[in-house]
Amino acid sequence: MVNIIEQLEKEQIEKLTADRGVPSFAPGDTLKVNVKVIEGNRERVQAYEGVCIARKNDGLNSSFVVRKISYGEGVERIFPLYSPNIASIEVVRRGDVRRAKLYYLRDRRGKSARIAEQTTGHSGKVAAAERADAAAVKAAKVAAAKVE
């Protein structure tokens, strides 16, 4: 029974990520999440940029928390990872942290809330791999458009 549920979740994840890839990111990374906002009969995309302070990996129910400071107030927003309301997720910079949950940032302001940028070669390799994947997806879309 559980295997059937896992299989269905896997299929749904593949279907939801077919048009937009989900980049690999971790707590400490600065993310730009483009969210689809519907106002009346208009739909627009709103950017939400902040630090990922937590990530919950739970298959289709995976989510992540992004924190930013807006007009001097800390604002946190929980995003379901595979939500159709998320247009795209972009990693702005990779942070170097030693915790999985960065809830201690809630109590910090200013310089003490800064996160060091990751300078290891691994982040460069990950970024290069993501760019290559994005280019491959774009090429596939162009090829599909030419066929039609």
Curated annotation (Swiss-Prot):
<dbReference type="InterPro" id="IPR008991">
    <property type="entry name" value="Translation_prot_SH3-like_sf"/>
</dbReference>
<dbReference type="InterPro" id="IPR038657">
    <property type="entry name" value="Ribosomal_bL19_sf"/>
</dbReference>
<dbReference type="GO" id="GO:0022625">
    <property type="term" value="C:cytosolic large ribosomal subunit"/>
</dbReference>
<dbReference type="Pfam" id="PF01245">
    <property type="entry name" value="Ribosomal_L19"/>
</dbReference>
<keyword id="KW-0687">Ribonucleoprotein</keyword>
<dbReference type="GO" id="GO:0006412">
    <property type="term" value="P:translation"/>
</dbReference>
<protein>
    <recommendedName>
        <fullName>Large ribosomal subunit protein bL19</fullName>
    </recommendedName>
</protein>
<comment type="similarity">
    <text>Belongs to the bacterial ribosomal protein bL19 family.</text>
</comment>
<comment type="function">
    <text>This protein is located at the 30S-50S ribosomal subunit interface and may play a role in the structure and function of the aminoacyl-tRNA binding site.</text>
</comment>
<dbReference type="GO" id="GO:0003735">
    <property type="term" value="F:structural constituent of ribosome"/>
</dbReference>
<keyword id="KW-0689">Ribosomal protein</keyword>
<dbReference type="InterPro" id="IPR018257">
    <property type="entry name" value="Ribosomal_bL19_CS"/>
</dbReference>
<dbReference type="InterPro" id="IPR001857">
    <property type="entry name" value="Ribosomal_bL19"/>
</dbReference>
